[in-house]
Amino acid sequence: MIQISDKAQTYFRKLIEREGVPGMGVRLSAVDAGTPRADARLEFAEPADLRGDEWAIDCDGFTLYVVAASVPWMDGAEIDYVTQSTGNQQLTIKAPKIKGEAPAESASMVERVRWVVENEINPQLASHGGRVAVQEVSADGVVLLRFGGGCHGCGMADVTLKQGIEKTLMGRVPGVIAVRDATDHATGDAPYIPRDSAA
């Protein structure tokens, strides 16, 4: 079920009226659904643009069409038009399922570690152009990672590993007892902080 506030409906209706195209609606879709990069996309949809498999939600003065493949990702979404503390108004979409759901506690440790790495750790490392990949998760709970991008060869990789990644994984995935680095940092060609300048 998707909730669309009255304010959001009024906002959409005004935009559609300005376009002046009979039968125009709004199409909602999930982009890169199930990944950390997931986002919602809204766009005008003329009747000729529709594929026929969209879910139609009748609103006050227009129809919101949800792309069929996006329906599971948009379940529980809320669309609103809010006034920010600065006085500016903004359309907001909260779609709690769009990035996927964390694996159940009954899932394997490997699945849970990969989910935390992809959905929590890598988005933070991306701000420095870095990333990590899970190379191995041993039966006794030792996670072996390989750094890439700006983290490959970075002088702060050890700090990131121990104070960031290891703490996060041990706190979020029961059974993880240690995190190790399998990266040959001497081969990094574009580190965020070169190893010889880290103190």
UniProtKB/Swiss-Prot annotation:
Indicate yes or no for the key word Ion transport.
Answer: no
Q: Where does [4Fe-4S] cluster bind?
A: 151, 154
Q: Do you know which InterPro entries this protein is assigned to?
A: Fe/S_biogenesis_protein_NfuA (IPR017726), FSCA_dom_sf (IPR034904), HesB-like_dom_sf (IPR035903), NIF_FeS_clus_asmbl_NifU_C (IPR001075)
Signal peptide stretch:
none
Per the entry, the cofactor note is: Binds 1 [4Fe-4S] cluster per subunit. The cluster is presumably bound at the interface of two monomers.
TM spans, by residue?
none
Gene3D superfamilies for the chain: Fe-S cluster assembly (FSCA) (3.30.300.130), HesB-like domain (2.60.300.12)
Could you tell me the superkingdom of the organism this chain comes from?
A: Bacteria
Which Gene Ontology BP terms does the record give?
A: iron-sulfur cluster assembly; protein maturation
Which controlled-vocabulary keywords does the entry list? Answer: 4Fe-4S, Iron, Iron-sulfur, Metal-binding
One molecular function GO term is: iron ion binding
Q: What does this protein do?
A: Involved in iron-sulfur cluster biogenesis. Binds a 4Fe-4S cluster, can transfer this cluster to apoproteins, and thereby intervenes in the maturation of Fe/S proteins. Could also act as a scaffold/chaperone for damaged Fe/S proteins.
Record's family? Answer: Belongs to the NfuA family.
Tell me what this protein is called. Answer: Fe/S biogenesis protein NfuA
Task: Give the originating organism.
Answer: Xanthomonas oryzae pv. oryzae (strain PXO99A)
